[in-house]
Amino acid sequence: MTFAGAALSGVIPAIARADPVGHQVTYTVTTTSDLMANIRYMSADPPSMAAFNADSSKYMITLHTPIAGGQPLVYTATLANPSQWAIVTASGGLRVNPEFHCEIVVDGQVVVSQDGGSGVQCSTRPW
């Protein structure tokens, strides 16, 4: 892209290419035991923390789903600002520690990986 014509005319050109709609975010949850898990993950960017707090269900998916030990559950989302909003949590109610593991991958790069006992949280910032 050249700006020579814009400099001569004194007009700033419009951006020639649109920025990507967002970043591809992949959330992965695994456990060592078969169980019913409670999983929550951010599926859309809230416009603000106040909007999220007012109605988190508009932005965060909540699932009660079976998970088999060693078999990953994978969820994807497109987020404009994953460094602000990417989060996945998982928990289960077993007497035996299910040893949860979670991971967040943004645009093909692992950005967070955590292990937990009866629950785990991966996020790109403190909540």
What are these regions (language model features)?
Residues 12, 21, 35, 96-98:
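Short loop/turn segments at connectors of secondary-structure elements within structured domains
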Residues 6-24:
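C-terminal region of N-terminal signal peptides and the immediate post-cleavage residues
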Residues 1-5:
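Sec-dependent N-terminal signal peptides
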